Amino acid sequence: MEFRTEHDSMGEVKVPADKYWAAQTQRSSENFRIGVGIETMPREIVHAFGILKKAAALANAELRPEKMTAEKLDALTKAADEVISGQLIEHFPLVVWQTGSGTQSNMNANEVIANRGNEIAGKKLLHPNDDVNMSQSSNDTFPTAMHISAVLAIEDKLIPAVDTLIATFKRLEAENEGIVKSGRTHLQDATPIKFSQEISGWRSSLERDRELLTLALGPLYGLALGGTAVGTGLNAPRGFDELVAAKVAAITGKTFVTSPNKFHALTSKDEIVFAHGAVKALACDMMKIANDVRWLASGPRDGLGEIRIPENEPGSSIMPGKVNPTQCEAVTMVAVQVMGNDTAVSMAASQGNFELNVFMPVCAYNFLQSVRLLAEAIVSFDKNCASGIVADKDKMYHNLHNSLMLVTALNPYIGYENAAKTAKKAYKEGISLKQACVELGFLTEEKFDEVFHPELMV
C-alpha cells in the first residue's frame, strides 16, 4: 500500500494514498480500534454531514464572501454533493466508539471534503478547518447531523413503511367485513368479534403511531448549527444560524429552522429521546400485531388456525411440511432491539454535562438503527406476510360456535349466574350450550334458537 504524508497540529501522519481523509481521521482510526469495519459511523450521519457542510459553505459565501470565495464555494459544494450522494462513503472509516462529541467524524468530513474539493479545483484551495469548518464547531455540527439524519430517516423511510402497512390492513378490513369469529382476552375465549374489527384495531394502532411520529418530528427540525463551541456562537457571523438552517431546509426540502436556544441544543438530547419514544411505541404495536398474527396462524391442526399466512420458505430442517411465522418472528426481534435501544438512547441523552453532551455517537447510532430496522421490518412484514393473510372461514365458524363464551348472550334472558351454570355444565360434560341450557331448564329449545345468534353479538 502506498502512503502520503499529512500533518495536523500534533505533527505528521502517514495516510493511505488513495484515501481522501487526512491526519485527524488517521489518528482516530489508529487510536480507536473498537468495532472496526462493523460499527462504523452510520451512513445517515455521513449523509447529514455532507448536507450541513454544503449549507454552511453557502451561508458563509453570503456572510463572509471575502473568505468563502466563489472558487472555494464551487469546489467545496461539489465535494459535499459527492458525500451526500454516497460516492465517498469508503472515505469515512471511523467507528462510533470515539470521542463522545463526534469531533473525529466532523474532522473526517472536513478532511474528505477539503481534499476532494482540492482535487476538483486542481490545486490546494480548501483547508479542512479554515474553510470546510468555517463558522462551525464539532459541538454544533454533530447535534445538527443527528437531527438532520433523524428527520430524514423518519420522514423518508419509517412513515412511508407505516403508511404501506396501514393501506394493507384497510384492504384486509374490507375483504373480511362479514366474517365473525371468537374474540379473545387473557388468551382465553371471549365474546365474538368481526375479523374486520380485529384488523381495524391493528390499523388504528399504526395510525396513532404515525401521529406520534409526526408530532415527534417538530422538535427535531431545530438545528444547533451556529452555536459553535459552547452555544455562544463564537467565530460565527451574525445571522449565520438562521441562514444556515434555511440552507439545510432548501437542500433537504424539510422545514428545518435554527434552534432558539443553542445552549440547550448542544447539551440536551431531549428531542431525540422524545422521538425515539415514538419509535418505541410503534415497535410495541408491531410486537402486538405480529404476535396476534402468529397466534391466529398457529396450527395447522393443533393451533387456532384461523388465518393462513404466506409460505415463504421451509420451516424446519427436521420436520417436513412445517411452515413457520418467520416474518412475525423477525418483527418481534426487531421490536425487542428497539426497546433495548431506547434504554441506550435515554442513558446517553442524560449525560449532558455543563455545555455539551459527550455520548452523541452512541445516541445517534442506536436511534438510527431503531428507525432503519423498524422501517425495513415493517416493509418485509407487509410484503411477505400481512398482504397475503387469508381468513379460514370454516375454522373461524367452528371455533366461534364451539366457544362457551357465547353464553354471555343469554345473560339478559336467564341472568349471569344461570349463564355461568350453563357454561360450566357444557364444559364439564362436553355438550353444547344449547343442550346444557335446555337440560338445566333455563330455556326451551325454541326460545334458545330465538335469542341465540352469535353473529349479532358484534
Identify the function of each model-found stretch.
Residues 1-458:
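Conserved, well-structured ligand/cofactor-binding cores
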